[in-house]
């Protein structure tokens, strides 16, 4: 039974995803359906959480829009979004960046990771 579930999970996994982790700034191209039309909306922010494994893996992106913090959680292997672009790599020491919710301005800025 577990082999059937594993095969089904592997069939629905996406292969076009870049490597990213907590602290990275990403652009998520989200498909928005309005009536009979669909369009692509870009949600850019910092990845504050990666959770789960396999097909059930999800990630949360946080941005500040007009002074209000907005967080959105996406299933990683979902057809909800078209693509993910990594804008910058962040240098953080935590896997979950919930402390960013309480920081404002320059204190909420994440140091950029240098690639060697």
From Swiss-Prot:
GO molecular function: structural constituent of ribosome
Cellular component, GO annotation: cytosolic large ribosomal subunit
The entry's keywords: Ribonucleoprotein, Ribosomal protein
GO biological process, one term: translation
Source taxon at top rank: Bacteria
Record's keyword annotation contains Ribosomal protein: yes
Statement: the UniProt record of this protein carries the keyword Ribonucleoprotein: yes
Family in the record: Belongs to the bacterial ribosomal protein bL19 family.
Described purpose of this protein according to its UniProt entry: This protein is located at the 30S-50S ribosomal subunit interface and may play a role in the structure and function of the aminoacyl-tRNA binding site.
Protein name: Large ribosomal subunit protein bL19
The organism of origin for this protein: Nocardioides sp. (strain ATCC BAA-499 / JS614)
């Amino acid at each position: 039974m577990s082999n059937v579930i594993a095969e089904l999970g592997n069939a629905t996994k996406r292969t076009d995803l870049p490597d990213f982790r907590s602290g990275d700034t990403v652009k998520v191209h989200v498909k928005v359906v309005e009536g009979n039309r669909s369009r692509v909306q870009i949600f850019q922010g910092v990845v504050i959480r990666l959770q789960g494994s396999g097909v059930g893996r999800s990630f949360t992106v946080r941005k500040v829009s007009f002074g209000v913090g907005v967080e959105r959680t996406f299933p990683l292997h979902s057809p909800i979004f078209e693509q993910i672009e990594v804008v910058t790599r962040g240098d953080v020491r935590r896997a979950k960046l919930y402390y960013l919710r309480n920081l404002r301005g320059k204190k909420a800025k994440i140091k950029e990771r240098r690639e060697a």
